[in-house]
């Protein structure tokens, strides 16, 4: 039984490899949606990605998909997806600095005619940034393509005061949840 990761995200690939899994990574091609609720958004996108890839596979493969969004409670349109460019990174950091936000991930596993979907949430507190820090970070390019416009495992680690919950969720794939789900589908590391 093979494992297929419905993502080409370097962070998800690295996390899953570190956990000891062998797999093939594939782009899902699923058009992501943004709903009113961050949990529903992450879960709907994870399910859509898993089902899109599973529908192209003929055999016994198990498909793993995930979606991560950053949510800023109390902010109109508080769901922050992936930063598109340096300007987007600066804008998102401006919203997040000095506040606590939530990182929501949906995880979906499909195989054998069934789909399981779960959700993880982690709280992150970002400190107030010094003048020029947002520009410095945006210029390095690391935040482009990242939910909320930052990468906790990279240079943005210096902006974070604390996290409450699963660190790997903030990186892009909540490993404890993912491993439990994969086990239920008969997939183990090694």
UniProtKB/Swiss-Prot annotation:
Gene Ontology cellular component list: cytoplasm
GO biological process, one term: nucleotide metabolic process
Molecular function terms from GO: dTTP diphosphatase activity; UTP diphosphatase activity
Stored Pfam families: Maf
Lineage: superkingdom: Bacteria
Residues forming coiled coils: none
EC annotation from Swiss-Prot or TrEMBL: 3.6.1.9
Required co-factors: a divalent metal cation
Catalyzed reactions: dTTP + H2O = dTMP + diphosphate + H(+); UTP + H2O = UMP + diphosphate + H(+)
Active site (UniProt): 67
Subcellular location: Cytoplasm
Site note Important for substrate specificity, residues: 11, 68, 153
Main location per the UniProt record: cytoplasm
SUPFAM superfamilies attached to this UniProt entry: ITPase-like
Keywords, in A-Z order: Cytoplasm, Hydrolase, Nucleotide metabolism
Protein task: Nucleoside triphosphate pyrophosphatase that hydrolyzes dTTP and UTP. May have a dual role in cell division arrest and in preventing the incorporation of modified nucleotides into cellular nucleic acids.
HAMAP family: Maf
Family: Belongs to the Maf family. YhdE subfamily.
Name of this protein: dTTP/UTP pyrophosphatase
Species of the source: Rubrobacter xylanophilus (strain DSM 9941 / JCM 11954 / NBRC 16129 / PRD-1)
């Amino acid at each position: 039984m093979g494992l297929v990761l419905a993502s080409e995200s370097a962070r998800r690939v690295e996390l899953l490899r570190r956990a000891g899994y062998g797999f093939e990574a594939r782009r899902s091609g699923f058009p992501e949606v943004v709903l009113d609720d961050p949990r529903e958004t992450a879960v709907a996108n994870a399910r859509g990605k898993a089902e899109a890839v599973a529908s192209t596979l003929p055999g016994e493969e198990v498909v793993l998909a995930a979606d991560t969004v950053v949510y800023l409670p109390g902010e109109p349109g508080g769901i922050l997806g992936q930063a598109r460019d340096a300007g987007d990174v600066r804008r998102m950091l401006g919203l997040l600095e000095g506040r606590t936000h939530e990182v929501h991930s949906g995880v979906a596993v499909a195989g054998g005619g069934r789909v399981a979907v779960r959700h993880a949430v982690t709280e992150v507190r970002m400190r107030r940034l010094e003048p020029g820090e947002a520009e410095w970070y945006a210029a390095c390019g690391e935040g482009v393509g990242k939910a909320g416009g930052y990468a906790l495992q990279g240079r943005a680690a210096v902006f974070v005061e604390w996290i409450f919950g699963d660190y790997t969720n903030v990186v892009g794939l909540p490993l404890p949840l993912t491993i439990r789900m994969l086990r239920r589908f008969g997939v183990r590391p090694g």
